C-alpha cells in the first residue's frame, strides 16, 4: 500500500473501524504501508494550516500495527515501481512512477490533481509552498512530455489519465482517457 501523503482523502481508506468501539484496524492487514518519512514527521507534528487534513485515526493505527515502512528518499519500492518526493503541496508527497508494459504511468497525486491543474500556475489553494509546487510541476511535466508518460489523476472525474503536448500556451493535456483504456484486454471492443 503506497500512501502518496497523509491527508485524509489519500490515506483514509487504509484503516477501518474495528467494531464495537474497539478502535481501528488495517483495511489490508497483510500489507506494508509505505509513506515518506518527511510526510510522516510533518503529519504527526501537525500544523494549523493542515490540522483538519491529518486525522489521527487514519495514521496512528498504521504505525501501531508495525506495518509502516518509511521512505527516506526517492527510490524503487518494487520492480518497475518507483517513487519521487515533492514538497510544495505538503512535505514528502510521494509521486509513484510505474513501468507498465511499454508505458510509464505517473500517479500525480495532489501535485497535479486533475487535468485542469496542468497549467503551471493552476494549483490547489491547499499547497503549503505554492512556488515550489510550480517548480516541481514544471520539472515533472517537462520530463513527462519528453518521454511520452501517461499522467494518472487522483481527483479528475472526467479524465482519469492523459498524455501531454506542447502548445503555444505551454504543456497541456493531449488525449484524455480512462484508466481501463491504457491497455484494454485482448478482444476488447475499440471505442469509436
Regions picked out by a protein language model, each given a short descriptive name:
Residues 12-23, 163-164:
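Metal-dependent catalytic neighborhoods of phosphoester/phosphodiester hydrolases
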Residues 81-87, 105-110:
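Active-site-proximal beta-strand elements of phosphoester/diester hydrolases
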Residues 8, 12, 92, 113:
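Short active-site segment of divalent metal-dependent hydrolases/proteases
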Residues 1-9, 19-85, 132-149:
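Metallo-beta-lactamase
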Residues 5, 33, 86, 96, ...:
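Divalent metal-coordination and catalytic microenvironments
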Residues 22-26, 95-102:
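Short amphipathic alpha-helices and their capping/turn segments at secondary-structure boundaries
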Residues 101-192:
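Cap/insert and terminal regions of metallo-dependent hydrolase folds
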